């Protein structure tokens, strides 16, 4: 069909239809979307949810025997809420993300069709279309050039090459022929026309995109922890319940004479009674509020992180960022502003006006307000001119361009001949060594210029020299020396230091030269000294061990690469495969790795890392492969994400502490009640209030606690560390046993004091006291992991205030109006005051403990 195409007329409508039918739309097939029902069922893979489902099924069997379904309904509601909340938020984020990526397919593209040049959406480009490209355009499909003028293309998104000169002749030493253009690359200079040879998945970027969606088997730290917790709970619950069943049944067989008779129905009833008690123990051991707490925490963080420029695509990424031990970051755009700027301009000879004229006319760049169109270096010069109050367009009107010689890698300079004010000038700008050689300079002037240039180059700046020549002059006159830089983002050095103080190693992986990479590393604080720095083992390590090039890295065997991986701080001249290999080696060391990337070539590394961080300005393939998108492209957002992740994990620990204290106390009360022969002092409806409603409220209160900068002073937790630390476990047992002792003593007192057992009024006291103990313990849970007072920032914790109010109001309503349904009787104001005052000791003991810890820490300092 290509032979029938006239490059002047382009395709006809009929030919467009035929081509589309044969080769398809110009759209990259997104990763296979999981169906909604599969996405929802995936939430049931959570180990805690699975234990809850088993408990719910056992509870359902017992419910049919006892004709009481409240406990069963409660567990099923807890499971449904936890899974549905997680499903909703993850689906909501996915929809937002797909809207963002779909917009990119609507970018307008100029094509020749039916003898006219028209604009069509990128998705409608077909094979054999004649496409027109110019400065600032993104190439919409793969193709072969038909014509071009000074065409330079940035292929870094695909090949890593920042600038490639194109020509109609094939060949060249690059990865692709010089007459080939590739989808997703950017036109930085010149213009051209090409015939489309591949669209959609058949393009080079389409092939890379397919690789970046391969499944990986890296388990997130949180999933591993919940797995371990589920295993522990199921083991402890099973051991306690089996032991209780054997002990109580054995005691009954030894002491109850009925076992010597033939009343088998009564014996079966006793066995069933003890079995039901054992099952109740298992159900009580499972923290049914935990999945809700996890999903609420992740979902709330997801929403909040969006406000701080982090679009989280996958829920687990919120928490995994808190476990990160290594960040492998790009330089351009993340550490720097990705906006070339003139740092220093040294005027040598000639007037300022003549220099301004040279900058305005000897260029191929344009400005769209403050946005440069064309070569970034030339755009920086025009922006400098604008900042000085000069309009480059007006300056161009003051002269007539006679001829222009574009920049080329062979010549390394650009020249423009103009007629201005009746005088003819030749303006030249380019590589300093080339321009200086053309100038009339004595040794002293040349040496001074070379020293100035060397100083700029040591600071990782790009240098240019300007010169001019009047028609009657024999040699050129050095006009100016310019140092251009892609400045660091102002917030980056502080953010890097924040990460390093938090025990996170920051590694820079860049395509820049070793000298530039080293200078940037010094500026952002990756390197402390010029010669030696502290290595991964805490010892002083030579600089050559901490810096490596992509070529050197590739030459290392897997064994050598494994040994070197942790000590590397900067990798220069790196390619995408180098970054992916570094991630793999660090993961082998047990590191939790986050990776930033903006190009399609970064997609595999983003996909294989524990957390892939794409840039908002990056390619759609990079975003698709990532877990989180930095909307502002800034490294500061990464540091914020780490803080959010660590705070989230701390909040989950706080909830676990609160939840398990309730469970331990309730578990012991079931056992204790069985020992003294009384029925469970809390009814099923009361347990539902304590276990489900209060747990949900607690999840809301603790999940909504704002992130704290304090967590950034700690070292990253090990992926192998159990979510329940030793001190936390001791606190759970101490509080749980203390609450049990208080409640059990009260129960025994009431049992022995009354003649007809414990009456409803006393059981209302018991129920309210139990709830108020948990109420005050919520304050202790809030302060877990910190020696700070539980009242610190209390007025800012609106979620906590609301929950405390709801618990108090809910308890009062249940006690006052619950009646037979909740087996309660109203309490007087005096009784409420006694219960609230006495149970508040839980908080004051906690405050005293934290005050002592604070004093001890101050003494150590």
Enumerate the predicted regions with their spans:
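Transmembrane alpha-helix entry/boundary detector in multi-pass membrane proteins
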Residues: 759-763
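Conserved cytosolic headpiece of P-type ATPases
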Residues: 1-716, 721-724, 737, 752, ...
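Alpha-helical transmembrane segments of multi-pass integral membrane proteins
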Residues: 731-746, 772-773
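Generic alpha-helical transmembrane segments
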Residues: 694, 739-740, 764-779
């Amino acid at each position: 069909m290509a032979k029938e195409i006239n490059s002047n007329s382009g395709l006809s409508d009929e030919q467009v239809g035929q081509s589309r039918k044969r080769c398809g739309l110009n759209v990259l097939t997104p990763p296979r979307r999981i169906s909604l029902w599969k996405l929802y069922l995936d939430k049931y893979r959570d180990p805690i949810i699975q234990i809850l489902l088993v408990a719910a099924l056992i509870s359902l069997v017992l419910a049919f025997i006892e004709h009481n379904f409240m406990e069963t309904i409660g567990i099923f509601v807890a499971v449904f809420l936890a899974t549905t909340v997680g499903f909703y938020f993850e689906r909501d984020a996915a929809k937002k993300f797909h809207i963002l990526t779909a917009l990119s397919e609507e970018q307008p593209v100029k094509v020749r069709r039916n003898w006219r040049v028209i604009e069509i959406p990128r998705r409608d480009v077909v094979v054999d279309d004649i496409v027109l490209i110019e400065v600032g355009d993104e190439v919409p499909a793969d193709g072969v050039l038909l014509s071009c003028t000074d065409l330079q293309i940035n292929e870094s998104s695909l090949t890593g090459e920042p600038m490639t000169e194109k020509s109609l002749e094939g060949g060249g030493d690059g990865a692709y022929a010089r007459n080939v253009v590739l989808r997703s690359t950017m036109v930085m200079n010149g213009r051209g026309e090409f015939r489309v040879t591949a669209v959609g998945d058949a393009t080079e970027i389409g092939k890379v995109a397919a690789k970046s969606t391969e499944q990986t088997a890296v388990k997130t730290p949180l999933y591993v922890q919940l797995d371990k917790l589920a295993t522990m709970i199921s083991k402890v619950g099973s051991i306690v319940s089996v032991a209780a069943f054997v002990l109580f049944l054995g005691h009954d067989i030894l002491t109850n004479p009925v076992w010597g008779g033939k009343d088998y129905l009564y014996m079966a009833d006793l066995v069933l009674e003890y079995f039901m008690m054992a099952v109740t123990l298992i159900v009580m051991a499972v923290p049914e509020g935990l999945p809700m707490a996890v999903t609420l925490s992740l979902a709330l963080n997801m929403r909040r992180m969006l406000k701080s420029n982090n679009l989280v695509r996958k829920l687990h990424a919120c928490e995994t960022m808190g476990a990160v031990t290594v960040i492998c970051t790009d330089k351009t755009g993340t550490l720097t502003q990705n906006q070339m700027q003139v740092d220093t301009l040294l005027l040598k000879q000639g007037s300022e006006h003549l220099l301004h004229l040279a900058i305005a006319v000897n260029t191929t760049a344009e400005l769209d307000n403050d946005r440069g169109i064309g070569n970034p270096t030339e755009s920086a010069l025009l922006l400098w001119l604008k900042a000085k109050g000069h309009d480059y367009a007006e300056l161009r009107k003051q002269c007539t361009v006679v001829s222009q010689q574009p920049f080329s890698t062979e010549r390394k300079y650009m020249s423009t001949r103009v007629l201005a004010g009746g005088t003819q000038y030749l303006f030249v700008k380019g590589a300093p060594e080339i321009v200086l050689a053309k100038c009339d300079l004595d040794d002293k002037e040349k040496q001074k210029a070379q020293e100035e240039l060397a100083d700029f180059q040591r600071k990782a700046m790009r240098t240019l020299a300007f010169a001019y020549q009047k028609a009657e002059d024999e040699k050129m006159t050095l006009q100016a020396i310019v140092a251009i830089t892609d400045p660091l983002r102002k917030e980056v050095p502080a953010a890097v230091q924040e990460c390093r103080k938090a025990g996170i190693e920051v590694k820079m992986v860049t395509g820049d030269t070793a000298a530039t990479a080293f200078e940037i590393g010094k500026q952002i604080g990756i390197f402390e000294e010029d010669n030696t720095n502290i290595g991964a083992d805490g010892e002083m390590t030579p600089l050559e061990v901490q810096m490596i090039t992509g070529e050197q890295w590739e030459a290392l065997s897997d064994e050598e690469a494994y040994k070197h991986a942790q000590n590397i701080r900067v990798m220069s001249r790196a390619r995408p495969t180098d970054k992916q290999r570094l991630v793999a080696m660090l993961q082998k060391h047990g590191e939790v790795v986050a990776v930033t990337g903006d190009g399609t070539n970064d997609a595999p590394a983003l996909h294989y890392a524990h957390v892939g961080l794409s840039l908002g300005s990056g390619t759609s393939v990079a975003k698709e492969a990532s877990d989180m998108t930095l909307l502002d492209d800034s490294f500061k957002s990464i540091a914020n994400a780490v803080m959010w992740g660590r705070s989230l994990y701390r909040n989950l620990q706080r909830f676990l502490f609160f939840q398990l204290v309730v469970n331990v106390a309730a578990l012991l009360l079931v056992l204790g009640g069985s020992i003294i022969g009384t029925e469970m002092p809390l009814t099923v409806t009361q347990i539902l209030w304590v276990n489900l409603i209060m747990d949900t409220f607690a999840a809301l209160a603790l999940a909504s606690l704002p992130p704290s900068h304090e967590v950034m002073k700690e070292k990253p937790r090990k992926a192998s560390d159990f979510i329940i630390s030793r001190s936390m476990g001791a606190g759970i047992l101490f509080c749980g046993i203390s609450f049990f002792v208080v409640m059990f003593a009260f129960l025994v007192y009431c049992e022995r004091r009354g003649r007809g057992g414990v009456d409803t009024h006393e059981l209302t006291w018991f129920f309210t006291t139990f709830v108020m103990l948990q109420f005050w313990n919520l304050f202790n849970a809030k302060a877990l992991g910190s020696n700070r007072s539980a009242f610190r920032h209390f007025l800012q914790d609106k979620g906590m205030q609301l929950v405390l109010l709801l618990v108090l109001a809910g308890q009062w309503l249940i006690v006052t109006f619950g009646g037979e349904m909740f087996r309660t009787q109203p309490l007087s104001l005096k009784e409420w005051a006694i219960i609230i005052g006495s149970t508040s000791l839980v908080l004051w003991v906690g405050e005293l403990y934290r005050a002592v810890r604070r004093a001890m820490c101050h003494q150590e300092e």
